[in-house]
Amino acid sequence: MVTAGMLPRAAVREVEARLRAAGCPDSDFDAAELFRLAAGEDARLADAPLGTEQAERLEALTARRAAREPLQYLC
């Protein structure tokens, strides 16, 4: 579960693992894109922990993608 206070790379790893477990192809790419959508920046460049709103948005996007909703529909 993605929570407020998580560091960006830890959040992306968590999302990637969940997507992989759900059978989503390209889970690493999808996790990075979902982070970018939720946080508004690239996880590789971000260094501040996730805020509450960012974490909630990333969690919601992850749940939708894990349910196999196409990434393009989430953008």
Kindly give the residue locations of the regions a language model identified.
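Non-catalytic nucleic-acid substrate-recognition regions in nucleic-acid-modifying enzymes
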Residues: 1-26
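Conserved AdoMet
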Residues: 28, 33-75
